[in-house]
Amino acid sequence: MYFYNPNEREVKELISGIHARTFWGENLMLAVVELDAGSILPTHTHLHEQGGIVLDGTLEFSIDGETRTLVPGDIYIIPGGVNHKVTVGENHAKVLDIFSPVREEYKY
């Protein structure tokens, strides 16, 4: 399949307050991620390289000890194996994450 409508894709809850619709090919995965106001994605790491762009809302993003407040249009790149954490502000947020290679645990 080459084309998708994200609104027709089932939503998967990754952790409480954080939901994603994922799409994948052979070597990369896209995730449209919606984060509830005040939600926190705790510090974690994975082997996958991750990049993304903020689509809506404000996030406090920490990568390898460096913290920035990100707004729509801001882009982040996280090398594999690097600690990162996300804290959502007073309103919901939405990001587009890109992973390589595909995160098998997010396929459904």
Named regions from a protein language model:
Residues 1-27, 108:
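A short, N-terminal "cap"/entry segment at the start of jelly-roll beta-barrel domains
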Residues 29, 58-60, 67, 83, ...:
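Structural motif
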Residues 31-45:
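Conserved short histidine dyad/triad with adjacent acidic residue
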Residues 43, 61, 78, 84-89:
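Short beta-strand His + acidic residue motifs that chelate non-heme Fe in jelly-roll/DSBH
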Residues 48-59:
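Glycine- and acidic-residue-biased ligand/ion/polar-headgroup-sensing regions
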Residues 66-80:
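Short acidic-glycine-tyrosine-enriched beta hairpin
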Residues 81-105:
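Ligand-binding loop in jelly-roll beta-barrel domains
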